[in-house]
Amino acid sequence: MTTNKTFSMVLAMTLNGGIGYQNRLPWKLKEDLQRFKKITTGGIVIMGRKTFESMNSKPLPNRVNVVISKNMKSSNEVQVFPRIEDALQFYNTSHQKLYLIGGKRIFEEGLATDKCSDVHLTRIGVETKCDVYLNKNIFSTFQVNKTSQTKSENGINYDYQHLINKNSHEQSYIDEEHQENQYLDMITKIMKEGVSKDDRTGVGTMSIFGQTMRFNLAQSFPLLTTKKVFFRGVVEELLWFLRGNTNGKLLLDKGVKIWEGNGTREYLDTIGLQHRQEHDLGPVYGFQWRHFGAKYKDCQTDYSNQGVDQVKEIIQLLKNNPDSRRIILSAWNPIDLKQMALPPCHVMSQFFVANGKLSCMMYQRSCDFGLGIPFNIASYALLTYMLAKECNLNLGEFVHVLGDTHIYSNHVEALKKQIERVPYPFPLLKIKGNKSLFDYTYEDFELVGYNAHDKIEMKMAV
């Protein structure tokens, strides 16, 4: 006799397929266990004998407990069947939902029945020690319905994903979607609604105006995963800003080419800076952050104690007057704009403290969604992490306010490829030691659990 009864699967798995270690879960995630309880309570949970034994042979409360075994016998607390198909047939007319909860053999045999309607998957971002693995592509025939925002607990980054078979209408149990979807959805919006515009570079853009994205910094670090982001470049550029540097060669010597195109002899000559030495970028971000109002000469001059050191003032305000509404960092100085190789794109940021949590809101006038924005998100998130550590604050949000929000015409095909990708959990960020904000090096920053799709090549418009 055949059955039309379907079931859901509920499991946690690393990105390489790890699900268990020594007949136990390899991680302790309290929130994930609470979610498991929320999903399965009131239903029928189907498990293998080893999974049942890993629970000290105690049935889960408020659920019908079913064990698949040829050796065990049914009791008042547990129903036993030799095969999954037998359990499905027995509960064919039951109004209760069925959930397969492990282990490996149960998941594999369950998929072989072709009765799995959906999967509630917890994706573990860190490869912890495991001795039981599923094929990491075991759910490749399912569609992603929803992906949650990244969470963290006990040094482990993870998220929830709801996978469905076509025609499934099961509940996802996901309240807040992955925050990288904001970025991907914005690309789609620009492609659908963007106005074609000429621009300074001659490449041309599709543009919209006045958008916002928000990232929760307390749970994870928002380094995009749908393409690999050059994190070392993000760090080195920010440290270069914080030191007040304007010499692009210092970045080039470290293999960071972000500013290379804007510092060449040819480029500087075309914007009227023939007197400037190659890779002297003028009074750009770092100069404005550390010496706002000082007279710029060249990148070799010592500007100590000249102008306003906005970064130091921010640190003092965060420590001594965190409720101030004047904790602002500005890179836009109209007097200096013509001396800059490139006027600031990320113009101003404001810092806000509530309940001991530090948040940052940054306004960006020109927003290159293909190349620039992934860097900008990570850079200001990193700055907020560093300021929070310096001032003994917890982390809040990064709010990104977007002015001219655009895609360059030569990035369209690459971005079409990117928006088809499903994000991985955001990584965690650890800052080692207790150095001054101005003394950190790249080696002081550690990404934990960064998994990303392959890099996508896009040419920078200069």
From Swiss-Prot:
DUMP binds at residues 200, 346, 364-368, 376, 406-408. InterPro entries: DHFR-like_dom_sf, DHFR-TS, DHFR_CS, DHFR_dom, Thymidate_synth/dCMP_Mease, Thymidate_synth/dCMP_Mease_dom, Thymidate_synth/dCMP_Mease_sf, Thymidylate_synthase. One of its GO terms (biological process) is tetrahydrofolate biosynthetic process. Its EC number is 1.5.1.3, 2.1.1.45. It catalyses: (6S)-5,6,7,8-tetrahydrofolate + NADP(+) = 7,8-dihydrofolate + NADPH + H(+); dUMP + (6R)-5,10-methylene-5,6,7,8-tetrahydrofolate = 7,8-dihydrofolate + dTMP. Pathway: Cofactor biosynthesis; tetrahydrofolate biosynthesis; 5,6,7,8-tetrahydrofolate from 7,8-dihydrofolate: step 1/1. It comes from the Eukaryota. Substrate binds at residues 10, 32, 101, 122. Residues 6-165 form the DHFR domain. In the N-terminal section; belongs to the dihydrofolate reductase family. In the C-terminal section; belongs to the thymidylate synthase family. This is Bifunctional dihydrofolate reductase-thymidylate synthase. It comes from Paramecium tetraurelia. The lineage of its organism: Eukaryota, Sar, Alveolata, Ciliophora, Intramacronucleata.
